Amino acid sequence: MLSAMSLRAIERLGIMVNNIFLLLLALAMLATKHVIFDFFLQTSYQRKNKGIYGHPGGLLHAGLHAAGTCSIFLVTTSTALIAVGIVVGEFLVHYHIDWAKEHIGYRMKWGPQQDAYWRSIGIDQWLHQLTYVGIVLVLATA
């Protein structure tokens, strides 16, 4: 599951490497990637247009997330088919979670001053994290 080079680097740090460690590392990498792409690198163009189905802004945002998901393959190994399936799945799920949140929020006219707005952000983030648990489960059973 771990590349030989990554395994040696981790073991030099005195960390005992096993499959549970690797899966937790992959999960931590996905969570970190999510914060970076959702809160630091997401542009106003992406944010404003995620609620319009098929808009390039939302597609770009989901595509960047999918590309960032490739980082887990630095510490794990899988077949090319599984890797492609994970990345495509991440793109599709991320896109539709974001679109649904934005679309519903727009239709309901939720803004930052309303509790429902903040709940929708919480549900959005929870669903994304569950997606990452799903990715790790795929890696664990592949």
What are these model-predicted stretches?
Residues 2-142:
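Hydrophobic alpha-helical transmembrane segments
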